[in-house]
Amino acid sequence: MAKVESFTLDHTKVKAPYVRLITVEEGPKGDKIANYDLRLVQPNENAIPTAGLHTIEHLLAGLLRDRLDGVIDCSPFGCRTGFHLITWGEHSTTDVAKALKSSLEEIAYHTEWEDVQGTTIESCGNYRDHSLFSAKEWSKTILDQGISDQPFERHVVE
């Protein structure tokens, strides 16, 4: 079975919240795709409940695209501690951390239910499992801790 980088990471050594560049893959024509670890809570110490994580996911899908060029996808980890962000091309972890911080600020302090995309039976595969209240509270908690552009030491972005 192929080795998966995420499963070789020592989850006891990282210091969340942080942004980490996992890999940059190059396609046969030179196209580059970057994969980032957007870790919002400390692994094995906490996990974001599914309804809040689901709402954060739907909001980040649009908010990160507004702040970073080339966003392909932002999908939650099964462990519920953060997200994979996939982009065309490579951004610095500082730029990604700043975009994440700005997006979480928008969620925490400015987002209303009407702003959440994909919350109907037609547009979401689990439309009943959302909580804007939880998304806002978790966003505030994460922002209070600061988002680092380094996974193993705290280097909080402004």
From Swiss-Prot:
GO MF term list: iron ion binding; S-ribosylhomocysteine lyase activity
Record Pfam families: LuxS
Alphabetic keyword roster: Autoinducer synthesis, Iron, Lyase, Metal-binding, Quorum sensing
Enzyme Commission designation: 4.4.1.21
Top-rank taxon, per record: Bacteria
Signal sequence residues: none
Alphabetical GO biological process terms: quorum sensing
Cofactor(s), by name: Fe cation
Protein purpose: Involved in the synthesis of autoinducer 2 (AI-2) which is secreted by bacteria and is used to communicate both the cell density and the metabolic potential of the environment. The regulation of gene expression in response to changes in cell density is called quorum sensing. Catalyzes the transformation of S-ribosylhomocysteine (RHC) to homocysteine (HC) and 4,5-dihydroxy-2,3-pentadione (DPD).
Family indicated by similarity: Belongs to the LuxS family.
Name this protein carries in UniProt: S-ribosylhomocysteine lyase
Organism for this UniProt entry: Limosilactobacillus fermentum (strain NBRC 3956 / LMG 18251) (Lactobacillus fermentum)
